[in-house]
Amino acid sequence: MIKNPILKGFNPDPSIIRVEDDYYIATSTFEWYPGVQIHHSRDLMNWRLVAQPLNRAELLDMRGNPDSCGIWAPCLSFDNGLFYLIYTDVKRHDGSFKDSHNYLTTCTKIDGNWSSPIHLNSSGFDPSLFHDGDKKWFLNMIWDYRPGHNPFGGILLQEYCDKTKKLTGPIHNIFKGTKMGFTEAPHLYKRQEYYYLLTAEGGTEYDHCMTFARSKNIEGPYEVDPNGYFLTSKDNPNLKLQRAGHGDIVETPDGEIYAVHLCSRPINGLRRSPMGRETAIQKAYWDEDGWLKLEEGGNEPYETVSQVNLEPHPWTKEPQKLEFKIESLPNYFQWLRTPYPQNFYSLTEREGFLRLYGKQSLGNQFEQALI
């Protein structure tokens, strides 16, 4: 039995892949450094943090980024022996404009030295990369800043060329979303004769949901699942897992389908979630009409999920107490914005201690001594 959430605490916007017998989930980190957290599992139940790819200035420098900006909704994929990571560095998110720059980096090892970033576009956020045979397709939601227009302007699709390292060809707006609005977080999948488009809708608060649409042509038009949302908590305030949405799916070697999604666990009656947005998992199946459904029925998230048909693989637990007689900080430590933490801390100045050097004020958005 798998108990949700599988990634507790601040781990929103999960993107999941399987590489042979290994499963990886990438999650957002916003203004916390290093950027993007990647967890690893072999049984979909036990997870460990194995990589934080955006760990040098060339890949990410968030000095000056406002609160809640930075890394939004990464997308992790794998093709022909290479890991691909698409990510957004948001420089501003208030008002009518959003400065959201989308990049691609690659690596042959999940915990290796990731390549120099390739800037793809800056037209929106929640980017995704879909590998379709010998073609690769880039998706993102488009942010429409024009007065009088829906800022969530639809899901854009454009081909990515591996040789030139650029987007190429026409841009297609393939899906404008449903009446829920706030259409974002696109992921594409191919099954039999259909392309399936998964999006998040309703905003990332208590109306959040996941919607499937499909088409026989990758450019659309896409028809929405006539049965409604694949997953949502919006109609049941008594659920322990609220704000369910923004997710991805993965298939096991035995053909079992699992969906990961963000959620939160609010304090009773207060609608406040001190643990932030977390990652949960649900078991799913393809119904006779070719739509993905939750195995347990309905479209609300379950706190427990039947055990996957995989050999249990627990990891050694991290120590509850850390003595600072170490050469470097463990990977579960983070700090704000800067790629140069050596400017404000030391593990050698006093043996067995983590020493912080005072920097800028608490409201500053450049360099604070906070770990």
Give each language-model segment a name.
Residues 1-7, 46-65, 104-122, 159-181, ...:
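Blade-edge beta-strand/turn elements of extracellular beta-propeller
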Residues 10-13, 34, 70-72, 123-126, ...:
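Beta-rich catalytic cores
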Residues 1-23:
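Short, Lys/Arg-rich amphipathic segments at extreme N-termini
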Residues 44, 48-92:
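Blade-loop segments of beta-propeller domains
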Residues 16-32, 72-95, 116-120, 128-151, ...:
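Hydrophobic core segments of beta-strands in well-ordered, beta-rich domains
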Residues 288-371:
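Extracellular glycan-recognition regions
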Residues 231, 235-288:
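Repeat-solenoid scaffold signature
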